[in-house]
Amino acid sequence: MSKLASRLVMLRRIFDKFGIPIFRKPKPVVAVLRFSGVIGQVGNPIRQGIYADGFIKPIEQAFNLKNLVCVAVQINSPGGSPVQSSLIFKRIRSLAEEKDVPVIAFAEDAAASGGYLLACAADEIFADESSIIGSIGVVSSGFGFVELLEKLGIERRVYTAGKSKAMLDPFKEEKVEDVARLKELQEDVHDTFKTIVKSRRGDRIVVSDEEVYTGAFWTGRRANEMGLIDGIGELTKTMQEKYGEKVVFKPVGEKKSWLKQRLSASRLMGFGQKHWLNQVIPVIEEKILWNRLGL
């Protein structure tokens, strides 16, 4: 053994004796990204929704951690904006392929609709037996105030250039041609959704398209049987089984400070009162999305 090698061995023994990990193999790191709530800027004013601008930076931080072996994605969402879902999905896939890092998703209460699309960004998907999974479809909802205006004696005046500019105006009677046009748009979005699911899940889905792509949703147990997910499991145990007991979990993403939460809440109070309707309707819409899943 050369003098240099002997000195290195001696130096290593000294560092080991004093617990200095300079020569030890670094512990594997799992970055943890959490997506919770409605997708898009439509959620509860106090608890903001999931949108690309707010998550691109944390996603990039996750893939740049040292000693990274995997990015774990926790999902608890009933869905929301297909565009925001797609933007986040694409960024995760782009970095996963660039960095050659596996992504594993874990569904909590729900990974439905856009929430399931986010899960499809992962190479593997796990869920609880009772998680709600699926809802691979498109829904549009709104309100009609025609009779309300009549009762209040209010006349609405709308001036447009272009016959479809005021399509589906909630203060006007619904038109058959407007609904037909909306359905065309929904079919386009649905086709995109189906293409993504098929490209990511492939032959793992063992049931027919007629069963999967109806907008229906299932429990985690049934979704596992269908091939919509890869197994029943939760983050900590699954990651330890894959990467060892000494795996280090590093949550990525900014948590709102107490002051920021108070400032968000002020939208419903004080200087936000004149816009109360714009604030209340998103809360109702968020509740409706969760209620569709029985949650």
Residue spans of the language-model regions?
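Short glycine/proline-centered loop/turn elements that form peptide/ligand docking sites
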Residues: 132
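N-terminal organellar transit peptides
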Residues: 1-105, 109-128, 139-295
